[in-house]
Amino acid sequence: MTTPNTGMPIKRKTLEKIIELKNLSKIFGKTTVVDDISLNIVRGEFVTLLGPSGCGKTTLLRMIAGFETPTSGGIYLEGKDVTKIPPYNRNVNTVFQKYALFPHLDVHGNIAYGLKLRKILLPEQEINEKLEKLRQKKSEEVVAKTEERLRTRTRLYTKKEIKAKVNDALKLVGLEDYGHRDVDSLSGGQQQRVAIARALVNEPRVLLLDEPLGALDLKMRKEMQAELRRMHKELGITFIYVTHDQEEALTMSDTIVVINDGEIQQVGSPQAIYDKPANAFVADFIGESNILSGIMLGDNLVKFLGKSFNCVSKGFAKNQPVDIVIRPEDITVHVKKSTKTQLNGKVISNTFLGTFFEVEIEVNDGEYQFTVQTNQNIALDAIVGLEIKPENIHIMAMEATINEIEAEMTAGDWVKIAGKEFEVTPQNDANGEEFGKGDRVTAFIPFDKIELTDDENDGTVGGWVTHTLYKGSYYQVKVWTDNDTLFIINTQYEWDINDRVGIKILPTDIRIQAREDLDVG
């Protein structure tokens, strides 16, 4: 069980933003990788961009760094538009998973490399010394003009300055005595520290870290997580960290930005993301969750698994479909009869995980299988009672209740959806008129009216499974087609992410409506 970072939260609305992303998008070919993202990053925060592989988080980081140019939108660093400014002119540095150290240079040489090329403004002490000498010979008018020129003059670092800065960087990453070492003689963790020192030695405003611990073993990753938190606290600069590892995000971050399919799903503190996920994707991706479908019966009352439960959620419409999240550690198991029991179930597995037992409990004759974390060692096949307190039932509005897909009428009663044509039941627009060729429409297809097949040729449309969510009596599967159309399917069968599938749709299950009618409604 992962414990979120619960350190003092940063009040994001009251602090100065250092980076502002405005309506940022990136399209490669026909694929939208980052889709209209807007985000403010507060100065001094440790921000983690978290999401599954291919969600767009690394592309977003590369655009902030300047290695990718946005298709649209803007990037602002300390209020300045840097969207088209090259990486070397942005005051940010990047640490990659592949360390990219120079094998022909020792540790000191690797860290010093950038310093040797960088020009700096004259230090204040140098300016004052030059002006003091000048005052002994020249008028104040000459001194003032000279000072103006000196304050814009640049020079390279001296060898003494480079040595001092490299030593400071080595000390920061815990490698004080390693300057003379060949980089090939270092362990993976030590090489990563050198890469971090090289990025920090130039004193960037922002440090970008692209899955920097991915190549390390578990023990080394844990150590480096603690080291990065220490460095961040000591330096006080902004860290933007990319990972797909939710444990890293929960334990290291001030703020987590959850990304999926190129869009931000939620922004918040680790505690808020864990306790109050914005949608089913976030709940499923962050930690372990029991996710069910339910109906709101009214304020503080929800129905799922055929029973009514008290909750602490208000403001939903009566009979509104909702997603329900219950964390495994928030369910109490009663091995003896109890008046507090709300559901009865059968233990079908029990695994000891060091500090707790993870128990799978089947309820309602297999309608749903709860994952429960408990300190009780419960026998297999035992019949137990489950208690769920109102404050532990988290209610979320469903992301969608039906597929709504942009489509176009091609001729007569034929409609083009995801690049394929379907002959649908004759339908009229809001004025009672028949649809004509070229009319823009929205196609509505229920989740449970679509069938998936593992033979793409058996389907009408082909696509890739990008997300699978267990919801008890069914799995909810997301499939993106090759022309970037999303279908959500409720199915009895579990599908793996990255499965290539065929999608079967019966024309009789398609309802169409003019898009302008929807806009008016």
Region spans (language model):
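Short coil-to-beta microelement around the adenine-binding A-loop and adjacent beta1/P-loop entry
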Residues: 31-32, 177
